[in-house]
C-alpha cells in the first residue's frame, strides 16, 4: 500500500508537467503548420498573380486591398469559411497580451482586416501596411519590403487566448512570409516584444517558437538567439 501511495504521489506530481509539455509541442506543431501553409500559398499566388505589389493592395489599411490579397492566398489554402472584411471569422473573445494585460482590440469588427478560417480551425486575419510593399521593418531586403501583416489564432476560440501562446503574427513581404520576431526584425523583435513575459506584449514570439521549437520565454527571461535558446 505504501508503494502504491508513493506511485500515486509521483504520478500526481509529474502529470501536470507531462500535460504542459504535450500542449507546448502541439503549439509548436500548429504554428509551424500555419507558417508552411502561408508560405506555400504565397509561392503559388506569386506564380499566378506576380509579387504582392501586383495584387491590388490599393492603400494603407484598405479593406479592399486586404480582401484582394487574402482571397488570392485563400485559393491555395484549405479554407472552411471566408469572411473577407465582414465579421464572423475572427473570434471576438477576450484576448490578453503575454504580460497578462487585456488586449482591447477587436479584429473581427475591424473592416481593414480580411479574415478566414482554415479547415483545421486556425483563424487568419490580414491587413495592408504598404501597397507598394516598401514598409521597413528590419535589417534585411525581405524586411524592408513589407506589404502587410497576418494575425493568427492557432486554435480558434479555445484558451488561453493570449498573444505569444496561441495568437501569433506573420509578415507578408514582397519576397515571402516572415514570422514576427525574426532575428533581423526591428518593429516586433524577440528582445523587445517577447523575451520578458512580465512586461512584453508577445508580438515578437512567433519566430522563436517556429525555429527554436519551444515557449521557454514563459519560464525564463534571459534567452537570446545566439547563446541561449532554452532555459536549461
Segments the model singles out, each with a brief description of its role:
Residues 1-23, 30:
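N-terminal single-pass transmembrane signal-anchor helix
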Residues 2, 8, 42, 46, ...:
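Contiguous, often N-terminal, cationic amphipathic patches that form binding interfaces
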Amino acid at each position: 500500500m505504501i508503494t502504491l501511495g508513493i506511485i500515486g504521489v509521483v504520478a500526481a506530481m509529474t502529470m501536470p508537467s507531462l500535460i504542459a509539455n504535450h500542449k507546448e509541442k502541439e503549439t509548436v506543431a500548429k504554428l509551424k503548420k500555419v507558417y508552411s501553409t502561408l508560405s506555400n500559398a504565397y509561392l503559388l499566388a506569386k506564380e499566378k498573380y506576380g509579387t504582392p505589389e501586383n495584387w491590388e493592395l490599393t492603400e494603407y489599411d484598405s479593406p479592399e486591398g486586404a480582401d484582394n490579397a487574402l482571397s488570392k492566398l485563400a485559393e491555395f489554402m484549405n479554407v472552411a469559411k471566408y469572411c473577407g472584411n465582414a465579421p464572423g471569422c475572427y473570434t471576438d473573445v477576450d484576448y490578453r497580451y503575454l504580460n497578462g494585460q487585456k488586449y482591447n482590440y477587436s479584429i473581427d469588427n475591424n473592416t481593414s482586416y480580411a479574415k478566414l478560417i482554415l479547415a483545421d480551425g486556425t483563424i487568419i486575419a490580414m491587413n495592408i501596411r504598404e501597397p507598394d510593399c516598401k514598409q521597413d521593418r528590419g535589417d534585411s531586403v525581405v524586411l524592408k519590403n513589407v506589404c502587410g501583416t497576418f494575425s493568427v489564432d492557432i486554435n480558434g476560440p479555445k484558451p488561453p487566448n493570449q498573444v505569444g501562446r496561441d495568437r501569433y503574427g506573420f509578415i507578408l513581404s514582397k519576397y515571402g512570409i516572415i514570422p514576427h520576431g525574426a532575428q533581423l526584425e526591428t518593429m516586433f523583435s524577440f528582445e523587445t516584444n517577447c523575451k520578458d513575459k512580465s512586461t512584453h506584449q508577445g508580438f515578437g514570439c512567433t519566430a522563436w517558437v517556429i525555429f527554436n521549437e519551444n515557449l521557454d520565454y514563459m519560464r525564463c527571461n534571459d534567452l537570446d538567439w545566439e547563446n541561449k535558446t532554452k532555459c536549461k
